[in-house]
From Swiss-Prot:
Binds 2 magnesium ions per tetramer. Pfam families: B3_4, B5, FDX-ACB, tRNA_bind, tRNA_synthFbeta. Its EC number is 6.1.1.20. It is found in: Cytoplasm. It catalyses: tRNA(Phe) + L-phenylalanine + ATP = L-phenylalanyl-tRNA(Phe) + AMP + diphosphate + H(+). Residues 712-805 form the FDX-ACB domain. The lineage of its organism: Bacteria, Bacillati, Bacillota, Bacilli, Lactobacillales. Tetramer of two alpha and two beta subunits. Residues 39-154 form the tRNA-binding domain. Transmembrane segments: none annotated. Signal peptide: none annotated. GO terms for cellular component: phenylalanine-tRNA ligase complex. InterPro entries: aa-tRNA-synth_II/BPL/LPL, B3/B4_tRNA-bd, DNA-bd_dom_put_sf, Fdx_antiC-bd, Fdx_antiC-bd_sf, NA-bd_OB-fold, Phe-tRNA-ligase_IIc_bsu, Phe-tRNA-ligase_IIc_bsu_bact. This is Phenylalanine--tRNA ligase beta subunit.
Length: 805
């Protein structure tokens, strides 16, 4: 929001430098990006009067002009502008002057004719091309007839103004207007602002409602207020220079007297308005409704836009003519032939307008204000002010009466707060009089009783609803620098990690000790990637306004992000990569308002865990390596129930023959295995193994009691056993049976060989184990070990059908 200090002085008596004003605004209200001085860097640019204008003897487009610049003799200047003519007052850059772009003007010759200066267009003075009126876009700017030759040109163009460029935060939409900013500065400097008065004269011979008919079909929440005025016999012409100056200093291009009037009122009141060419309406009909599927509208920028069913439309009959609160349609644009204006003033829902502006990538001055909120109590006043201004500038008449499609009973907000609460929050000892004075400066009517303030908040401050908002206003006006510094009171406490935080921290250490590097992936991904590798069935959570098509949906799994990271590394010739990530996934059910956040931990390895080196053979990653990492990690959690791995083909993104679900007791807590070759190809990665665990579930599971046990001082005894067993019997089943039958002194069971080649019958495999026995208190007797070992052999034969070899 650009605030002209010249315009601001219409409201307040401020003999204060712009830099000081900007600093005060920034310290008290909103951020300031800087102070703009349009004439900065320009020198010796004056008003000129073209006395004569003759064709150049050696050019078909140049002119040789004699120009009075207030000196004893006129200057001869060669100019190529098509609109230069004798008698015009123009902008002259004298010899040795500086103009826009740090350009120095010198005496020169143009095709043999001396030229002692330059006749300037606005963009040559540094004006943004987007702000230059179209009628002078290809020529020089013509100054008013009363401009005095030789005077510096800056005051005639508003370039002597100082403009404060504010970055208005979403909660302070009231400062997107001159009125709102004036109220803010009046409170800061303890002044009473002079607000503009509206002098509207209606033509009693015409009634607006006789010609203009408005129907609002949209929901009252979407369109709480919709009003119109009718202005007849309007002449469309360029705006007077004072208005053009105010418009371009506000950062907008002057168009014509009607459009400029609506933009002027927009800047003054913060109320978006829209002017329709009444003669282009269908029998004077205005209908406000939601768009239908498949409808199109060509907007003022010439773009044909396919409308969405969430878009609010202004229609004439059933024909869309305007995207409500965003941009008008080309069909009802005000042109030089327009004579009757249908003027709209309305309140539209902020969310609706924000969605429309985002969906169509169409952000305008109007949509920005609707998104941040507008003063509902000022809509009718702004509409009247614009109608009066259009009638004055266009020599028209305002038809009597306002046509109301829908009205809103705007009631001020009342907030109650007591002095003790204010001082408690701010750490101050403010008096009743001090706080009352601040509310008076804010122009908030206040009733005080028993040290309690009942504050009536004007409709222009729609951001204030609760006591905390009033405390913020008091702090701002009192001055943040004046608030006392208060040391914390109370007994200090020592912080401690909770169980989840401690497990997460330990998990990271364990993964890194296993050779994995931490990765942090985006929580947002595509809908397809979000659903991939999900441990449990869930709805997805999608953003209403994603920043890109690649970041639309909250993830259900960490693995997809890790595979993206692997692909990134593989594309850069890094093929031996081992990553892990600890983070949240987001599960959602239809009845939930927001998704449930669950801590997961996942890993992915590809290439070789041990690269080829001198004396060391390369060891490509395989299922057993990643399963070993998972097993070691789960062991560190000291879970009470047994961990089991069950082969599965339920994960379509995983290899069906090399994937296992992980259970603790009967609860599914994760999976481990090889990524399906098709999935790996889609990600452009090599053979890859992954795991993912539900960390929240693991933390909640019961833990085994951990007790210290000293290392035995007595020797151990080992026994080896080899067996033929059915191919579908798992190692876990065999180990569980051996542990069950092995006796009190069995300490460890280790699988050391698997064979199913030649000499092994079909459907069978050979497994070999080492069993370690040890007593904590005495040296084991060989007979005791033999007895226990034979019980194991018997159990293997009887219960698993094993053939001992």
């Amino acid at each position: 929001m650009r605030i002209s200090t010249t315009w601001l002085r219409d409201y307040l008596k401020l003999d204060i430098p712009a830099d000081e004003l900007a600093e005060k605004i920034e310290r008290t209200a909103v951020e300031v990006d800087g102070v703009i001085r349009p004439s900065e860097g320009l020198k010796k640019v004056v008003v000129g009067h073209v006395l004569t204008c003759e064709p150049h003897p050696d050019s078909d487009h140049l002119h040789v002009c004699q120009v009075d610049v207030g000196e004893s003799e006129p200057l001869q200047i060669v100019c190529g502008a098509p609109n230069v003519a004798a008698g015009e007052k123009v902008i002259v850059a004298l010899p040795n002057s500086w103009i826009g772009g740090h350009t120095k003007i010198k005496k020169s010759k143009m095709r043999g004719v001396p030229s002692n200066g330059m006749l300037c267009a606005l963009d040559e003075l540094g004006f943004d091309e987007k702000l230059v009126p179209k009628e002078v876009a290809d020529g020089i700017f013509i100054l008013p007839d009363d401009a005095t030759p030789g005077d510096p040109v800056f005051s005639y163009l508003g370039m002597d103004d100082e403009i404060i460029d504010m970055s208005v935060t979403p909660n302070r939409g009231d400062m997107l207007s001159m009125n709102g900013t004036a109220h803010e500065l009046a409170a800061i400097y303890d002044q009473q602002p002079t607000m503009p008065k509206v002098d509207l004269y209606e033509d009693a011979t015409t009634v607006a409602a006789d010609d203009l008919h408005v129907a609002v079909a949209a929901d009252e929440h979407d369109v709480p207020m919709y009003k119109m005025r009718l202005i007849k016999n309007v002449t469309i012409k360029p705006s007077p220079l004072w208005l053009q100056i105010r418009i371009w200093n506000a950062g907008m291009r002057p168009i014509n007297n009607v459009v400029d009037a609506t933009n002027y009122i927009l800047m003054q009141y913060g109320q978006p308005l829209h002017a329709f060419d009444f003669d282009q309406l269908n029998d004077g009909q205005i209908n406000v409704r939601l768009a239908k599927a498949g409808e199109h509208l060509t907007t003022l920028d010439g773009e044909d836009r396919e409308l969405l069913t969430s878009d609010l439309l202004i229609c004439s009959g059933d024909q869309p003519i305007c995207l409500a609160g965003t941009m008008g349609g080309l069909a009802t644009e005000v042109t030089d032939q327009t004579t009757t204006i249908a003027l709209e003033g309305a309140v539209f829902d902020a969310v609706k307008i924000r969605k429309t502006a985002h969906n169509h990538d169409l952000h305008s001055e109007a949509s920005m204000r609707y998104e941040r909120g507008i003063d509902h109590g000022m809509t009718a006043t702004a509409l009247d002010a614009a109608a009066a201004m259009i009638a004055e500038l266009g020599d028209g008449q305002v038809a009597s009466g306002m046509v109301i499609g829908r009205d809103e009973d705007v009631q001020p907000t009342t907030v109650t707060i007591d002095l003790a609460r204010i001082n408690h929050v701010l750490g101050t000892e403010l008096s009743l009089d001090t706080v009352s004075d601040i509310f008076k400066r804010l122009d908030f009517p206040t009733v005080v009783a028993n040290e309690t303030f009942t504050v009536t908040v004007p409709s222009r401050r729609w951001d204030i609803h609760i006591p905390a908002d009033l405390i913020e206003e008091i702090a701002r006006l009192y001055g943040y620098d004046n608030l006392p510094a208060t040391l914390p009171t109370g007994q200090p406490t020592i912080g401690k990690l909770n169980e989840t935080q401690q497990v997460i921290r330990d998990s990271r250490k364990l993964m890194e000790s296993a050779g994995l590097t931490q990765a942090i992936s985006y929580s947002l991904t595509t809908e397809t990637k979000s659903k991939a590798f999900a441990l449990h069935a869930s709805d997805v959570t999608k953003l209403d306004f994603p920043m890109s098509s690649e970041r639309t949906t909250l993830r259900l799994s960490l693995v997809s992000g890790l595979l993206d990271d692997l692909a990134y590394n593989n594309a850069r010739k890094e093929h031996n990569v081992a990553l892990y990530e600890e983070g949240r996934v987001f599960y959602s059910q239809p009845e939930q308002v927001r998704p449930k956040e669950i801590e997961h931990i996942a890993g992915a390895i590809t290439g070789s865990m041990v690269p080829k080196s001198w004396g060391v053979a390369e060891q490509p990653v395989d299922f057993f390596q990643i399963k070993g990492i998972v097993a070691g990690y789960l062991k560190s959690l000291a879970l009470q129930d047994a961990v089991s791995y069950v082969a599965t083909a339920e994960h379509p993104e995983m290899h069906p023959g090399r994937t296992a679900d992980i259970y603790v007791g009967d609860q599914l807590v994760g999976f481990v295995g090889e990524v399906h070759p098709t999935t790996a190809k889609a990600y452009k990665i090599r053979e890859t193994y992954v795991f993912e665990l539900d960390l929240t579930a693991l933390i909640a599971l019961p833990k085994a009691r951990q007790q210290y046990q000293p290392i035995s001082k007595f020797p151990s005894i080992t026994r080896d056993v080899a067996m033929l067993i059915d191919d579908d019997v798992t190692n876990a089943t065999v180990v569980a049976l051996i542990n069950k039958k092995g006796g009190a002194h069995l300490r460890h069971v280790q699988l050391f060989d698997v064979y199913n080649g030649s000499h092994v019958p079909a459907g069978k495999k050979s497994l070999a184990y080492t069993l370690t026995y040890q007593d904590q208190n005495a040296t084991l007797v060989d007979d005791d070990v033999t007895t226990a070992f034979e019980k194991v052999l018997t159990a293997l034969t009887d219960e698993l059908g094993a053939e001992i070899r």
